[in-house]
């Protein structure tokens, strides 16, 4: 039997063994994080969206990736989707949701531009800071990655970021890129409670997903130092946490000292 067919049969058998509730989003993600509910920006983005949109969902924690080799991913009434943007588009259409309906087209455009800046640019600076520049591999060790695997993961980060382009820069240049992104976001938010004003928009989920890793999961590296220059961004993180994660303490491992209960 070809390898692809074997994989399909395996996934089918797994689904037979697991019956999920109808009309409930099944969110597949890795295990809970030390100080924020996930070490993945995109898990934080998607789960915050589900809470914001008040969509019924359940978590399945594990290492199983989607057919595209990505996580997080979801199942909904037997249908599998991956990539947070496609997932959110699907759920908006399925549940007839528009979290941005109160905002103008100009505001929506600005919000998406900042989302893309953070996801396509800032993300890579944080990746280098967290997983490559730290010679002690603090992040890897805190989440329990075996020492012999760390070498291969760091090499993968180095190769991926080099191919992207940002990995060709010096650490000083990368931190300069990071700081300019954060300053731009800080200037735009100003005294707003959320990205576009006193109420959150859909893009706040993505912004929070990215900032949450700098604020809670820098593991003592430099990214957090840059973020703390901007009080309004730190306050923003706390505000998003309070608004959408009242059960935060139940969703973290507190530095791997306890098991998350949700």
Model-based region annotation:
Residues 31-33, 56, 93, 97, ...:
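Short amphipathic alpha-helical interaction elements and helix-loop-helix interfaces
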Residues 43, 84, 88, 108, ...:
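Generic preference for well-ordered alpha-helical elements
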Residues 59-65, 198-200, 252-256:
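Acidic carboxylate-rich catalytic motifs and surrounding loops in phosphoryl-/glycosyl-chemistry enzymes
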Residues 2, 234-262:
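C-terminal helix/juxtamembrane-tail motif
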Residues 45, 49-52, 90, 177-188, ...:
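Amphipathic alpha-helical segments that form well-ordered structural scaffolds
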Residues 1-152, 195, 215:
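GST-like domain detector, emphasizing the conserved glutathione-binding G-site
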Residues 124-232:
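GST-like fold's C-terminal all-alpha helical module
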Residues 58, 222-226, 248-256:
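Structured alpha-helical bundle/scaffold domains in large eukaryotic membrane-trafficking regulators
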């Amino acid at each position: 039997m070809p390898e692809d067919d074997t994989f399909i049969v395996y996934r089918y058998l797994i689904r037979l063994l697991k019956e999920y509730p109808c009309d409930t989003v099944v969110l597949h993600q890795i295990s809970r994080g030390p100080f924020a509910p996930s070490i993945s920006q995109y898990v934080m983005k998607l789960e915050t969206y589900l809470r914001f949109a008040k969509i019924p969902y359940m978590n399945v924690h594990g290492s199983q990736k989607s057919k595209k080799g990505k996580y997080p991913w979801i199942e909904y009434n037997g249908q599998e989707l991956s990539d947070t943007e496609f997932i959110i588009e699907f759920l908006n259409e399925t549940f007839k949701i528009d979290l941005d309906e109160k905002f103008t087209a100009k505001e929506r455009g600005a919000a998406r531009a900042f989302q893309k800046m953070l996801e396509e640019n800032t993300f890579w600076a944080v990746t280098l800071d967290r997983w490559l520049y730290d010679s002690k591999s603090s992040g890897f060790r805190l989440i329990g990655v075996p020492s012999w695997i760390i070498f291969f993961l760091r090499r993968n980060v180095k190769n991926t970021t080099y191919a992207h382009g940002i990995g060709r820069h010096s650490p000083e240049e990368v931190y300069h890129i990071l700081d300019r992104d954060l300053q731009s976001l800080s200037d735009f938010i100003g005294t707003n409670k959320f990205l576009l004003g006193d109420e959150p928009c859909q893009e706040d989920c993505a912004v929070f997903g990215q900032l949450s890793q700098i604020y809670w999961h820098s593991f003592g590296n430099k990214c957090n130092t840059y973020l703390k220059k901007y009080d309004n961004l730190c306050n923003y993180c706390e505000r998003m946490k309070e608004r959408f994660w009242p059960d935060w303490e139940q969703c973290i491992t507190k530095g791997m000292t306890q098991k998350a209960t949700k």
